[in-house]
Amino acid sequence: MNAQPGTPPRESVRLVSRRDVRLVNRAGHVYICSSTGTLRVPQRNPELSELEGDIGLEFLPDDVIAGLRSRTLVHSASDAPLSHPLYDTGGPGATRPAVVVGEGPLADGVAERLRRAGAEAVRAPAPDRSADPGALVLPLHGEETLLRRWTERAMEARAPILTHLSSPTRLLFAVLDPPRTACPVCLVRRLRANHTWQPIADLPLDVLYGAAESDRWPTTAIAAAMLAHQTMAALTRGTSGPAELLEVDHATLVTTRHPALHTPLCPACAPVAAPPEPAEPPAVDPESCWGRMRRAVDPLTGLVAEVRVRDADREPGNSTTHVLTAGHPTTTWFSPVQASSCSGAVKYDPTLARVCAVGEFMERYAAGVYDPDRLVRASFRKLGAAAVDPRSLPLASEREYAALSRIAPFDPDLELDWVEGRSLTTGQVRYVPACAVYVPYRFPRRRERLIDPISTGLAAGSGPHHATLGGLLEVVERDAVAVFWENRLALPTLDLGGLTGGPAAAIVERLTAAGVQVLCKDLTTDLGIPAVSVRYVEGPADRPMVAHATSAHLDLHGALLGALEEADLCRTGLRSWLAERDIPGVDDIELDRSDFYTYYCGPGRLSLVPFWDEGPLRPLPAPSPAPASYQAAVEEVVRRLAARGHEPIAVDITPVDVAECGVRVVRSVVPGLCPITLRRDFRRRGGRRLYEAPVRMGLRAAPLTEDELNPYPLPLG
């Protein structure tokens, strides 16, 4: 039977239950049932001891009423119109109107449902400063200039933006809170940059995505209800956490979540958006890194459409995992150049392989995203001592200048673009030529083309020290292989028989069992930072597959493992390239990137570089202790470089969207060290170290002349 009020213990004071709440007295307890769960409290009212069934609030003691009010299960009768388990009547925007932009059945439906829920809904065709919006409902397919003005108005009012695009088959919407999150302009530019068919990506967004609505369509009514609901939640509860673009499939009602990342150089929110700077972890944890970085992988709004894992025949504990990224944004939607998009990794740890593949993409993406207006425009002479002398990068030799009209000799009075970096030895600001930071880089004038931009020194990491370390070690690696290759040095061969257990031993054992010849050279130079180069040779003598790779590390064992893994990645690429294209001729000058990998796969090509097989056999040293942190590792590398007179410089080029994925990208530059190039006719032989390092290392009695340097191309890997 239902309990009757009888004589209530106290008079109800204009309180009512939320509409989804039921109070049931049963078995000595009062059960509070609602859509958010069920609570149970002991029965303390004597009048309820012999009654069971539904009861009213008047039978509950004050402390229970207070608890229910704190959970929004009970509220003042005056709040009844807004009462809902997902809405908070005391939220930041509850007293301000929702501004609904646009005309048509969808906007009409959203405004009407908001009013029925008790909220104030205002229609506005254009940004109006007289209104103080608590939330903004904004179609995503408006003109960018209008989206920008609305975004600026919302940021002034500190109001969340519910932006949307509705079609008969799906609804796209996001609750944004710029500048904390991306803004609608960010989202539009990202959607365009990721669109499959770039020739039409500039069409109005409603055309690209088939936006349409009708008051006869249930899908329009569904979209209006969902948008009104999300607006009510934003009005009454505010926003928090990372933003997402939700995609609701009307056929299946399946919801897919896409990351809503800031777009670099957004004209609406970039001036006030602050990239996140989380604390740098002391060591790389692949799982936690991947947990942050996987936000970058999404076909609609990500930096990378997908990650492809090639490990179908992987043997757990005895093999490597090969990962490639696929589907990359057209960065010319927000940068003057198209960033390089190829990236991949081979690692013993499958999660680390994913992290490194996406990290490599982020390096190249970051290096292709810049604003020319933010560069420092000045001559070397005008900047003075704060500027890095471009001749120390180094530049071309006199002979190379004479042979190449596209490369211009350096003029100290010529205005160039510069990027602000920081010296790792003094902490002072140093200006680095933009062409040595960004790749690709658009030279404003032909006479400013001092070099062909390359990626050496680019690195992504979980923090600034991690990224700086990776970049510095890559610079050291490239310097070591350039000195070795150009001077055709007979350097020690590492005795791999000393490997006992661990990933490096497993890789060598697997490859050797497959008939691959594995040769490892110790390329460590006078800098004292270990560098190892690896060569794999397999297949018939008339068509061998030859893979090369080099790596540097503070521990020679770390350099060895890095080179072995990188060469494994190179093997995978070689299989595709050798199947698709011819091997370049011995004397071919014009080579593309893949030619530098395949050049030594031609018959008899290894005989051109006999020094690879020369040099003493050297046992592996004992492993070196790891530094306590990335910062300590950077300091040790800097110490060794400074001891040889080199000043390393770091330039943080992290775009905001990369930072939102927990990654930093740094370009490390070490003036004076030797670079590599992707040109056979331009090797930047103008620096002295290329000639003098072998003498300092005791490997040459006198420097070689330029005529005596190796004429054959350096293999990539």
Model-inferred region functions:
Residues 121-133:
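Short acidic low-complexity segments
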Residues 154, 183, 228-231, 559:
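Hydrophobic structural packing positions in well-ordered secondary structure
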Residues 153-169, 235-253:
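Short, charged low-complexity linear segments at domain edges
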Residues 2-4, 26-29, 34-120, 175-177, ...:
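Long, charge-rich, low-complexity alpha-helical segments
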Residues 60, 67-70, 241-717:
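Helix-biased "structured C-terminal domain" signature
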Residues 221-240:
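Internal hydrophobic alpha-helix adjacent to the cofactor/substrate pocket in enzyme cavities
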Residues 133-223, 267-270:
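E1/E1-like adenylate-forming module used to activate ubiquitin-like modifiers
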